[in-house]
Amino acid sequence: MANITAAMVKDLRESTGAGMMDCKAALTETGGDMQAAQDWLRKKGLSKAAKKAGRVAAEGLIGALTSGKKGVVVEVNSETDFVARNEHFQGLVKMIAQVALDVGADVEKIKAAKVGSITVEAAIADSIATIGENQSLRRAAALEVSEGVVASYVHGAVIEGAGKLGVIVALESPGKTDELAALGRQLAMHVAAANPQAIDAAGLDPEVVKREKDVLSDKYRQQGKPENVIEKIVESGLKTYYKEVTLLEQAFIHDSGKSVAQALKEAEGKVGGPIKVAGFVRYALGEGIEKEETDFAAEVAAASGKK
């Protein structure tokens, strides 16, 4: 039997909003599997939403930079937020974004690229020596279109183009560049706020869609609903799900009375041509990284020789 810890119960509560005893039961029933426990709670109707429990704790900055038809977003991590506010580190992030715009999104190629007489990797090493704290280029992404624009938005910017969250959006269109750029920035802001998982339903991971269908089916099957009724409920539930997680079906944050798809269609007249979302990338600082928590009481006890 898996050892169910208080920390596991706490994490499940934070990600689902379910009660403590329900969370403990879910973890016990699923052998401590956090994802399976979230599904178990949803099937029992005990969780309103199964948001992924992503404890984001890494520090640093997200840098986003565009130039006409191409754009990049990079994540450079540091150990503390203090370093993220350091002008030298901020300059490093902007320099790395510029290099990525020139050479592409391959992290190893970025690190090997030269800026002046030294490589980016050497510049990072120099920054570590100067500031006295570890820093690293974690990831990078790039978008490019043959016709249209790539726009960006940085939320919580500490300097232009660098902050805690960065988005780039690629729009393909033969229309007016200035109008497209303004629309692209609005769309990038939408992506930052709404966090879509794909452009449309076709872009979603089939396994994720299957899991959603299974959760909905099992939930209503446990309630004793007939199979023909369950099929209709699941179909309706998936439509709602798509409106929540796909960009084109989400309510546009700048005009909630329209979907993003409708807003783009209406903008085509102003832009002067058809508009297609070719892609988007959203980087939130530290997502997927867990920062080691310090137990100060334990450290003090260890230092004093206490057990």
UniProtKB/Swiss-Prot annotation:
GO MF entries: translation elongation factor activity
Matches recorded under InterPro entries: EF-Ts_dimer_sf, Transl_elong_EFTs/EF1B, Transl_elong_EFTs/EF1B_dimer, Transl_elong_Ts_CS, UBA-like_sf
Principal cellular location given in the protein's record: cytoplasm
Highest taxon, organism lineage: Bacteria
Cellular compartment(s): Cytoplasm
CDD domains referenced in this protein's UniProt entry, alphabetically: UBA_EF-Ts (cd14275)
GO cellular component: cytoplasm
Keywords for the protein's UniProt record, in alphabetical order: Cytoplasm, Elongation factor, Protein biosynthesis
Keyword Transport: no
Coiled-coil boundaries: none
SUPFAM superfamilies per UniProt: Elongation factor Ts (EF-Ts), dimerisation domain, UBA-like
Region (Involved in Mg(2+) ion dislocation from EF-Tu), start-end ranges: 80-83
Entries under PANTHER family matching the protein: ELONGATION FACTOR TS, ELONGATION FACTOR TS, MITOCHONDRIAL
Family to which this protein belongs: Belongs to the EF-Ts family.
Role description: Associates with the EF-Tu.GDP complex and induces the exchange of GDP to GTP. It remains bound to the aminoacyl-tRNA.EF-Tu.GTP complex up to the GTP hydrolysis stage on the ribosome.
Descriptive protein name: Elongation factor Ts
Taxonomic source organism: Bradyrhizobium sp. (strain ORS 278)
